[in-house]
Amino acid sequence: EIPLRLVGSEMCIRDRKYIMINEFYKDMTGKGSVIRQFFDYANKKGAEIGMENIYNFSIGNPSVPVPQTFTDRMIELLQTEDPVKLHSYSPSLGLPSTRQAVADSLNKRFGMNYTMDHIFMTSAAASALAHALRCVTKDGDEVITFAPYFPEYVPYVTGTGAKLTVIPADITTFQINFEEFEKSLNPNVQAILINSPNNPSGIVYSTATITKLADILRAKEKEYGHPIYLISDEPYREIVFAGVDAPFISKLYENTICCYSFSKSVSLPGERIGYMAVNPACEDAKLLVLMAGQISRFTGHNCPPSIIQMAVESVLDQTSDLSIYETNKNILYKELTRIGYEMVEPGGTFYMFPRALTEDANEFCWRAAKELNLIIVPGDSFLCPGHFRISYCVTTDMVEKAIPLFEKLYKLYR
């Protein structure tokens, strides 16, 4: 039986009617995303002077088309499939054929032994993360993540009743700051949340980094007497540059829950399609997937559309042409370091994270926007002040035209 109670509400009189509102979410409405502020400024300014005069590096929206295979499969499904089946409800865990296809793809590519019972289809990585966290945490538990990190981790974790602890960044490498991490471990820690390749730094955690992390977690599991889950946020898994060591994290630690999205790898952010894959060696692996289906009853999540699940089966072993991202990275890294900017070279994604030229990165980014129409976002949002993020999922032409603006920005401070 599900207990019912009223939490965090107040009674208001408005037009002589009693209205119940939730104070927690009401307070959130006044805390808008800084990234969104810059994005909105770019659109407003672009409406005045023309978007071609705005150099918008604020948002991580893929700039390359979906593989033709996906488009062809969508057309084929619409032309040949029974429309009733095509537009019917999906089972709560996802279509069996899609879940099995995902498992087969992971097994083939990474030498794993997933079955469909280890796969839960989701509305991209955000939904996968929210479900994974609810599977393994409760009120009073603790989740650890590492700066710089995706700001939405805060509501994902606090929505479970758990506490999010953020380990300060090692800004010399942006690999895991193990000294601070080990100080923060305690019996309340139920999960570690990582993102590699990383938004916003573009850094990829090496095999050595993940192996060391796994060894520490195994030792602490024995000490504390309970599993510590590694929740791996992997929407950029396929965007890794030449020669970069990029391990499949689930291969290196048993209690790993992989949260994946097709938004970046095959340019499907609007379709909201991804999955949660529980390592078969994970404690209660199959049970966690069944639990995710029950959690959906509380979150209102009811699987991605059936047609999108069917179509994505055709691109499980494909990507969009991602080469433009490495081209853009190479140009920006070469030119910005020539100018004098300091940064750790990205190993993947379509982000880089240079040091700002003043400690107040927020002021630095607003000056770039208002004086140069150059839209970049401050690192404070990622709990890494003194840095700024460049999202280079744009045309190479825009990257090349923006270099003189980055040089002008540098000269404003040096």
Per-range role (PLM):
Residues 21, 26-124, 131, 315-319, ...:
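N-terminal small-domain helix-loop-helix segment of the aminotransferase-like
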Residues 11-12, 57, 196-199:
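Flexible low-complexity scaffold tracts in large eukaryotic assembly proteins
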Residues 65, 325-330, 339-371, 388, ...:
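Conserved PLP-binding catalytic core of the aspartate aminotransferase-like
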Residues 299-305, 316-321, 330-357, 378-383, ...:
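Conserved small-domain helix->loop->beta segment predominantly found in fold-type I
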Residues 254-326, 330-334, 410:
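Conserved core segment of the aminotransferase class I/II
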Residues 16-18, 104, 108, 182, ...:
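PLP-dependent enzyme catalytic core of the Aspartate aminotransferase-like
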Residues 85-225, 237-252, 399:
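Conserved core of the PLP fold type I
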Residues 1-15:
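Single conserved hydrophobic/aromatic residue that forms the stacking wall/gate
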